[in-house]
Amino acid sequence: MARFEDYRVFKTAVGGRLLQLEIGKVCEQANGQVMVKYGDTVVNVTACASKEPKPDIDFFPLSVDFEERMYAAGKIPGGLIKREGRPSEHAILSSRLIDRPIRPLFPKGYYNDVVVVATVMSVDPDCSPEVCGMIGSSVALATSDIPWDGPTGSVKVGRVDGQLVINPTLEQREVSDMDMTVSGTKEAIMMVEAGANEVPEMEMLDAILFAHEEIKKIVEFIEEVVREVGKPKQDVVLYKPLEEIDQAVREYAAPKMREAIQTPDKLERLENMDAVEIDTKEHFAEIYPEGGKDIDTVLYNITKETVRAMILDEGIRPDNRKHEEIRPIWCETGVLPRTHGTGLFKRGQTQVLSVCTLAPASEAQTIDGITEQTSKIYMHHYNFPGFSVGEEDFEVREEEIGHGALAERALVPVLPSVEDFPYAIRVVSEVLSSNAYLMGSTCGSCLR
């Protein structure tokens, strides 16, 4: 073992099973790395960052990849090529699970490229590789020299015979009436993703609090690991608008932006906000000829802070609605003549056309995943074209998959059993106009 001088192993119990972290044995050129072992599940997680900020951008370029290797389950990929190709739907959803809790903890103004890769190398059906990837990403970032205000902990929660269970086994998941993934720090919850069979709200809250107690233990364990093997954090240059520009733009534009944000109609509101931005840029063009990026950033911050303050302090939303007010709803069924079922759902300026197709049960989607081979009798696909927000077409593949999975998770618990209704069901939700209402696809799918 002399060749692995920095190799360290850390162990703890999570959900009654051994969680093992191995650091310093492989991937020595990555900024941060950990091999997570939980049961027989093994996930290698790396974190890498560029040395310099990415020029001419105003966002944080974080990329998260969850890579499934078929050898992890003792399988050879199907098809002619016999090689892993594009990520599966499960891999995309798992990447989003990892991304959501870690993204907010990077410092504001940090524009370096950061890539987190979780590679599933061995799979135990009883030990979730997604949870291993989430914990591993936290460890890799926390022990690296990349600036990050973690760590976070993550668990799954199920409920079997009325008892909450941390990281339920495959057998327990099959009889559980709740499937929840929770991630957080010691102080707060960062992310919740859940599906349940009509579980009351307070019982869901109990499950979140139950998960948080285990998360605190995981975070304390990771903090011990960081104290042992953590690298000093890089001294990085964080982008921040010049204070002089920030103050001047706020004094000039904040009252005007507030008035524009309160416009009830979305299209008119966007036009008014654009007018404020154009006016502000023209006003400061000669005063700060090189301050274009700073002005854009301050205008964005003004908008975000104004909307947040209106909601939290005054209890009103951008179109002057209160918390409990909803936009007018309009529905229509039987929109298309030759389809099996259609529902057009409209709420405010959101329009979603959901189209249902029935087929024999043999048409169910076969999923040959790394954990198990299953068939999906209900499929929900979500299309979000650029014209729905008045823009040129753009690629939103991951978002479409995520929103389709959200609607699918909401509808599956209330569908009839295969024995009572032996048909495959495919629903396609076409977003025709969008105004920030994600559940339009779910509502439209309930129409008939």
Regions found by a protein language model. Name each.
Residues 77, 81-83, 93, 97, ...:
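Small-residue-enriched alpha-helical segments and adjacent helix-cap loops
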Residues 18, 30-115, 120-122, 127, ...:
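Glycine-rich, flexible beta-strand/loop modules in the N-terminal catalytic cores of phosphate-handling
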